[in-house]
């Protein structure tokens, strides 16, 4: 009994694979999953600091208002709104009659 597997069977005095050109959907799916896994692994190793920083600190936007009195929160909101209102002068308002 040979220790060679089916994939390692010598073909025409060369080592080759009998499954080349296989159109089996399971083989195609396995190849796609393998390629995606490799791509994700490479991206993970390249950008792991950025990725895990997002998980560590979350996707918070803007300053935290935790522990800030409500009066200061309202003052901050008014300042932000006044900054937005000041920019409205740059736009042209067209009114239809």
From Swiss-Prot:
Compositional bias segments (type: Basic and acidic residues): 71-80
Keywords: Disulfide bond, Glycoprotein, Host cell membrane, Host membrane, Host-virus interaction, Hydrogen ion transport, Inhibition of host autophagy by virus, Ion channel, Ion transport, Lipoprotein, Membrane, Palmitate, Phosphoprotein, Signal-anchor, Transmembrane, Transmembrane helix, Transport, Viral ion channel, Virion
Activity regulation info: The M2 protein from most influenza A strains is inhibited by amantadine and rimantadine, resulting in viral uncoating incapacity. Emergence of amantadine-resistant variants is usually rapid.
Site (Essential for channel activity, possibly by being protonated during channel activation, and by forming the channel gate and the selective filter): 37
Glycan-linked positions: 20
One Gene Ontology term of the molecular function aspect: monoatomic ion channel activity
InterPro entries to which the protein is assigned, alphabetical: Flu_M2
Gene3D superfamilies: 6.10.250.1640
Intravirion topological intervals: 44-97
GO biological process: protein complex oligomerization; symbiont genome entry into host cell via pore formation in plasma membrane; symbiont-mediated suppression of host autophagy
Entry GO terms, CC: host cell plasma membrane; membrane; virion membrane
Region (Disordered): 60-85
Sequence intervals crossing the membrane: 23-43
Residues recorded as bearing Phosphoserine in the entry: 64, 82, 93
UniProt keyword annotation of Ion transport present: yes
Membrane topology: Single-pass type III membrane protein
Virion surface side: 1-22
Domain notes: Cytoplasmic tail plays an important role in virion assembly and morphogenesis.
Note: When the channel is activated, one or more imidazole moieties of His-37 probably become bi-protonated.
Recorded family membership: Belongs to the influenza viruses matrix protein M2 family.
Reported function: Forms a proton-selective ion channel that is necessary for the efficient release of the viral genome during virus entry. After attaching to the cell surface, the virion enters the cell by endocytosis. Acidification of the endosome triggers M2 ion channel activity.
Assembly description: Homotetramer; composed of two disulfide-linked dimers held together by non-covalent interactions. May interact with matrix protein 1.
Protein name as annotated: Matrix protein 2
């Amino acid at each position: 009994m040979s220790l060679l597997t089916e994939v390692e069977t010598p073909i025409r005095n060369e080592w080759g694979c009998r499954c080349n050109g296989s159109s089996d959907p399971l083989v195609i799916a396995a190849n796609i999953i393998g390629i995606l896994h490799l791509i994700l692994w490479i991206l993970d190793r390249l950008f792991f600091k950025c990725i895990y920083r997002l998980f560590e600190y979350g996707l918070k936007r803007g300053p935290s208002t935790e522990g800030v009195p409500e009066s200061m929160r309202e003052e901050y909101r008014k300042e932000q709104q006044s900054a937005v209102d000041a920019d409205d002068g740059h736009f042209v308002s067209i009114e239809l009659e």
